[in-house]
Amino acid sequence: MEHIFIINPSAGQGKAVKLIPKIRKALEGTTYAYSIYTTKAAGDAERFVRETCEAGKEVRFYICGGDGSLHEAVNGAKGFPQAEFGLMPVGTGNDFMRNFGKKQDFMDILSQVEGDSVPCDVIDINGRYVVNMANIGFDCEVAAQVGKWKQKPFIRGPVAYLIGVAAEFAKPMGRRMSFRWTDGTTMAGRFLLCTLANGCFCGGGFCSSPKAALNDGLMDVGIVKMIPRKKFIGILPKYKTGTYLDTKLAAERVLYEKYRKLELAVAEPANISIDGEISQFTYLKAEMVPSAFRFIIPKGLEDGAE
């Protein structure tokens, strides 16, 4: 088996590139066959993984980047559910790995190579695999702000997220959305935000979907009705810790359920954040794909997926 480390040179303001000498130092002189591939542009990781899988090679991929890099790579392995992916989280948010442990748990190279893998679901949204989460509305607009602020020196993920929240509070909030469930029932109205979650975390550690599991075959759908700004500010600390669902405000204003499929439409093109990357949509169909890929748990780390 070959162990392929995929380096995203733009991830984490260049932190991924700094891993190259550490990878070589850890694996040279061992019996592990390995190689290092540095991506050349957006979408290159997806192409590289797809071509490698189609060639029938027995490999493991280790993504040196963030959630966006993992998103690309897993999309390259569509149709290859036995493809194995490790993650060395040097991106901005690094939310996917939070479902299993802390960042330092994933930074030891030998522990990654010697780790076992577990099956993980994905959400298929209009033909694209979502590894962690899709956000629409307030959360998505904050993510767009984070994308701007994270380019600034000394501003890290959680700080950038809080700045993004403050910036969005100054704008008109809410968007009209129309939902259709698998039983044919519909719901329409003006909502603050909607999350379609495979994992629990977004925004660099905000536990927006505390009941989510990566292997239950279900997406956690959170729909937040319009909330006055003052009340929303008050609930933010509990939104970060994942305890907001226990509040009276959530009982009145939050719809939180698990689904296998749903459809969502908006009247005008709207932003959607998919694994932290921003695009636009007017209609989407979301459907769970169970056990779509395998995720490597570093040796010695308790398996958080089970």
Region spans (language model):
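Gly/Ser/Thr-rich active-site loops/lids in small-molecule metabolic enzymes
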Residues: 150-160, 204, 210-231
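Glycine-rich beta-strand-to-loop/alpha-helix junction loops that act as flexible
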Residues: 9, 64-66, 90
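ATP/NTP phosphate-donor binding region
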Residues: 1-61, 107, 302, 306
